[in-house]
Amino acid sequence: MTDDTTKNGPDATAADAAADAAAYVENDIAQEEAPQPDALELLKAENGELRDRYLRLAAEMDNLRRRTEREVKDAKSYSVAGFARDMLAVSDNLRRALDAIPAEVKDAADAGLSTLIEGVEMTERAMLSALERHGVRKLEPVGQKFDPNFHQAMFEVPNPDVPNNTVVQVVQAGFSIGERVLRPAMVGVAKGGPKAAEAETNSVFDEKDA
């Protein structure tokens, strides 16, 4: 009876409390003795993380700026594409009307007819000049290697003097706007000549910009 009282009485409670206190003190001492992170290293790591985030954000903003500038430029360049095609059709009709007049009629034309012909020619030139001011450029394919991206082959012309598939005749002029083809040139290409050299060629746009 006396032994049980000793084990479970106030002395046992005090012993447990002392053990808990000792464990707490040991744990506190261990935490104090553990190496603490260096404040300077923590600051460097934080600065490095912030710098990476800033660089990523700056790159994203630069990409957004470039994309926006490109989209604005394209919108300005290509917004008139449909209108330009319609104007080219009108220009084609003016040219057909002029070409339909026989040379002898032009030579023998009176003042009224001559004035009319000159007026049509001036209108055609003014229209093409206005289109050019808005970025529409005429393609000059004669002598170039046939390129389906810019040319539409209408017929072949036997010609042993020029490389095969060289553009030798233009039936209808082609035009570009910006870096796009507004209308391919309708052309005749040579056949029967030497094989074209397998060399890398510049695009029509590169040649115009050179």
Curated annotation (Swiss-Prot):
Keywords noted in UniProt: Chaperone, Cytoplasm, Stress response
Principal location: cytoplasm
Record-linked InterPro entries: GrpE, GrpE_coiled_coil, GrpE_head
Entry's localization field: Cytoplasm
Gene3D superfamilies noted in UniProt: 3.90.20.20, Head domain of nucleotide exchange factor GrpE
CDD domains in the cross-refs: GrpE
A GO MF term: protein-folding chaperone binding
Cellular-component GO terms for this entry: cytoplasm
BP term (GO), one: protein folding
Domain of life: Bacteria
Family: Belongs to the GrpE family.
Subunit note: Homodimer.
PANTHER family referenced in this protein's UniProt entry, alphabetically: GRPE PROTEIN (PTHR21237), GRPE PROTEIN HOMOLOG, MITOCHONDRIAL (PTHR21237:SF23)
Function: Participates actively in the response to hyperosmotic and heat shock by preventing the aggregation of stress-denatured proteins, in association with DnaK and GrpE. It is the nucleotide exchange factor for DnaK and may function as a thermosensor. Unfolded proteins bind initially to DnaJ; upon interaction with the DnaJ-bound protein, DnaK hydrolyzes its bound ATP, resulting in the formation of a stable complex. GrpE releases ADP from DnaK; ATP binding to DnaK triggers the release of the substrate protein, thus completing the reaction cycle.
Protein name from the UniProt record: Protein GrpE
Source organism of the structure: Rhizobium leguminosarum bv. trifolii (strain WSM2304)
Gene that encodes the chain: grpE
